[in-house]
Amino acid sequence: MNDRMVVYQKPTCSKCRETLALMRESGAEFDAVNYYEQPLTVERLRELIDKLGVPARDVLRRDEPLARGLKLGEGGLSDDELIKIMVENPDLIQRPIVVRGDEAVLCRPPEKVKRLL
């Protein structure tokens, strides 16, 4: 397993900052990717969701005004459709997502990162 982790995050997100702090405290080596400055592609987000082992709907921030306005939490859209919408609107992506090798964890709460440390 590759020891270096990758954190997909938004720097202003409190859960992202807490996760990064836990990783630093553990001495883990990682790269932080601000997916607002380095946007995710459809392919990359699909890969992350596959590593998480969940449907795309589980990575959707349903409480975001845009998600509520588009009624994205109500179902009816395929994973591919949801992924495309999330890539176009990164505020809709749950964060942070931490990847180590073939494993990924959605760190909500931040303590979930300990599974990869």
Regions found by a protein language model. Give the residues of each.
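Thiol/selenol-based redox catalytic cores and closely related redox-interacting motifs
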Residues: 37-117
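Local sequence-structure signature of Cys/Sec-based thiol-disulfide redox active-site neighborhoods
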Residues: 2-26, 30-35
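A contiguous, well-structured "functional interface" segment within a domain
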Residues: 1-13, 96, 104, 115-116
